Amino acid sequence: MSAIYNFCAGPAMLPAAVMKKAQQELLDWNGQGVSVMEISHRSKEFIALTEQAESDLRELMQIPANYHVLFMHGGGRGQFSAVVNNFLGEQGKALYLVSGQWSSAALAEAQKLAGEAQIDSLNIVEKHNGLNAVVLPDLHKIDADYRYVHYCPNETVDGIEIFDELDSPWPIVADLSSTIMSREIDVSRYGLIYAGAQKNIGPSGLSIVIVRDDMLKLPSLPQSSIMDYRLAVEHDSMFNTPPTFAWYLAAEVFAWLKSTGGISSIAKINQQKAQMLYQCIDGNAFYRNGVVAANRSQMNVTFQLVNEALDGEFLKQAQIAGLVALKGHRIVGGMRASLYNAMPLDGIVALVKFMNEFAAKHS
């Protein structure tokens, strides 16, 4: 069978080695004679798995000791509401930086739940010569007492990524769903990091939360117990039955990433993959990208065919060539190639070859 390269934005492809291992031990995990999907989440064997998963993630991301690592339900959208309910209180204030679709969605959820609390927002994307560009504000010049400032460093729909570290006088809450472990960051700069698992961690249904200890002292709002960070910490992410199979696969992905050299190693590969694809787009008048070079996403490369009438044929021929899930988000259209950690360099080589051949044929 010819290789299939899955460019889906999420749920995304998983490392081939992880998938093969999961396949091999699906019916008999760890010598238990049953699947990991069937074993008790409170068994000593599964507890050992969760402890190893947290240890590996802490090592990979260099997470300081004063941070808790939580494995929770609900994905990224679940965390939109959890952040508000856990930190805002009845009279709190929060600032949301808007750079695209997902930060806009987080803002909308905060506004819906805030009640008497105050939610402010700043649009940080401007047009520079017709291209989208991020302009980070000087937050130290804002006279306000915010509980936190929320932002999304990578917008998967818009193909926008913020590489500069945010400098804030208030705790930073970051949605890292699409960039977690794709490049190195300084975790100590953040009050809370959350990430839906279905891009760089594992299957959908799981979210990772990395929260600094002092954030748990902020006033909270009434909320569902399963989204209460304090309860999650108290019960080691097992206040209720967790998504065990997703947790198992996340543990395997962490182990795989360590075996490949860790985040510093994968970051170099990710940069190389993105550069190859953007060079193809920029070097051919057949394609275009709408983001300034400094803010082009390494994880989600968006592009359009200058002749949009060829979109359908492009996707059809790409599918035949084994290049799947290249259709852009329904909101913005065009094309999108998601280059998460599991996407091998060979996938980009194949995509660039196809794009060049398609352009030559239809120019």
From Swiss-Prot:
EC number of the protein: 2.6.1.52
Catalysed reactions, as listed in the record: O-phospho-L-serine + 2-oxoglutarate = 3-phosphooxypyruvate + L-glutamate; 4-(phosphooxy)-L-threonine + 2-oxoglutarate = (R)-3-hydroxy-2-oxo-4-phosphooxybutanoate + L-glutamate
Classification via Gene3D superfamilies: Aspartate Aminotransferase, domain 1, Type I PLP-dependent aspartate aminotransferase-like (Major domain)
Top-level EC class as recorded in UniProt: transferase
Residue ranges crossing the lipid bilayer per the database entry: none
Co-factor remark: Binds 1 pyridoxal phosphate per subunit.
Major subcellular site: cytoplasm
Binding site for L-glutamate: 42
Record-linked PROSITE patterns: AA_TRANSFER_CLASS_5
Cofactor(s) required for function per UniProt: pyridoxal 5'-phosphate
UniProt keyword Protease, yes or no: no
Pathway annotation: Amino-acid biosynthesis; L-serine biosynthesis; L-serine from 3-phospho-D-glycerate: step 2/3; Cofactor biosynthesis; pyridoxine 5'-phosphate biosynthesis; pyridoxine 5'-phosphate from D-erythrose 4-phosphate: step 3/5
Record's keyword terms, sorted: Amino-acid biosynthesis, Aminotransferase, Cytoplasm, Pyridoxal phosphate, Pyridoxine biosynthesis, Serine biosynthesis, Transferase
Subcellular location per the Swiss-Prot or TrEMBL entry: Cytoplasm
Any one Gene Ontology cellular component term annotated for this protein: cytoplasm
Binding site for pyridoxal 5'-phosphate: 76-77, 102, 156, 175, 198, 240-241
Modified residues (N6-(pyridoxal phosphate)lysine): 199
An MF annotation (GO) of this entry: pyridoxal phosphate binding
Alphabetical list of Pfam families matching this protein: Aminotran_5
InterPro entries, alphabetized: Aminotrans_V_dom, Aminotrans_V_PyrdxlP_BS, Pser_aminoTfrase, PyrdxlP-dep_Trfase, PyrdxlP-dep_Trfase_major, PyrdxlP-dep_Trfase_small
One GO BP: pyridoxine biosynthetic process
Function: Catalyzes the reversible conversion of 3-phosphohydroxypyruvate to phosphoserine and of 3-hydroxy-2-oxo-4-phosphonooxybutanoate to phosphohydroxythreonine.
Subunit description: Homodimer.
Family recorded in the similarity comment: Belongs to the class-V pyridoxal-phosphate-dependent aminotransferase family. SerC subfamily.
PANTHER family noted in UniProt: PHOSPHOSERINE AMINOTRANSFERASE
Protein name (database record): Phosphoserine aminotransferase
Naturally occurring in which organism (per UniProt): Shewanella baltica (strain OS195)
Gene symbol of the encoding locus: serC
